[in-house]
Amino acid sequence: MDTATKPSVVPPATAPGDGDGAQQAGKATPPVAQQKPLSERKPKLARQDDKWKIFSGTANDALAKDICEFLGLPLGQACISKFSDGETYVQIEENVRGADVFMVQPTCDPVDVHLMQLLLLIDALKRASARRITVVIPYFGYARQDRKDKPRVPISSKLVADLLTTAGADRALVVDLHAPQIQGFFNIPVDHLFASPVLVDYFRKKQFPDLTVVSPDAGGVERARFFAKKMDSALAIVDKRRVEMDVTEVMHVIGDVKGRTCLILDDIIDTAGTLVKTCQALLEAGARQVYACATHPVLSGPAIERISQSGLAEVVVTNTIPLTEAGRNEPKIKVQSVHGLIGRAIQSIHEETSVSRLFL
């Protein structure tokens, strides 16, 4: 068996007060307009007991550590390694009997490895008598296989939901599902967070006077309309059509973008092919500059090279998926953290309070 991989313990915060929203000695509470978004404010003192714990797989332990630091909790100790034949081995290395446990693990590339880790960790926690297990899945792999679009194919996202439930998960916390109806595939409660508060706050600070939010396809119109409303901006849509077989898609821009700053909004950037084509169509339609933002930076294949060589001014993503070294070194890619958003949701679930206050 190979050497175990152990998440390091994050020491408790030294001053876990009310953070930016707190009234400090001799200082008045700042105006609401100057405060950070609710999802990014430091929480009130987390209850320092051993009845709630946060663990992480290897998919995004940096995000898990940030969440723990935000809440003033240590990261739970777990051993994750492989046997010589490639089988995954996990062991929970501390007592979880009667604890409210949160397991942070996006099922990103390599998807099957991270999914198997998650299933085994859930099973280990259940057999160790954890009182409740909440799977925190910032990026839900297989979400794009949510229906039968061809004969004799599986509905993979439904199968994954069943596997998580069968393994012993009592609750799920997810961020920006590709298809919101996936919540209905679960037989357990699902809290569906949106990264919009983090992304809206980032672009509000830029104070674009002529912003138009753009949906890259018809399926994303509702998401773009919601974002445009929060940004008090115009809305445009790019309609892709293939006029003939074996003929390149023609992209029609619906809406006024001439001389304006355009912001392409999507939930996932995978190969970045659609993103770059949308950017080119907007520039050809007279857009002054084009930005893009998405929650999940899958960035597979030639994505980073395409972004680098494109006319995009900036691509803003979140850390639901860790970037590769090439992604971190690409100056056009900017990362905003969702650790505060997820941390607030975890605290609300543990304290049995409403999670909806985190929504825009």
Regions found by a protein language model. Give the residues of each.
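PRPP-associated nucleotide enzymes
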Residues: 1-360
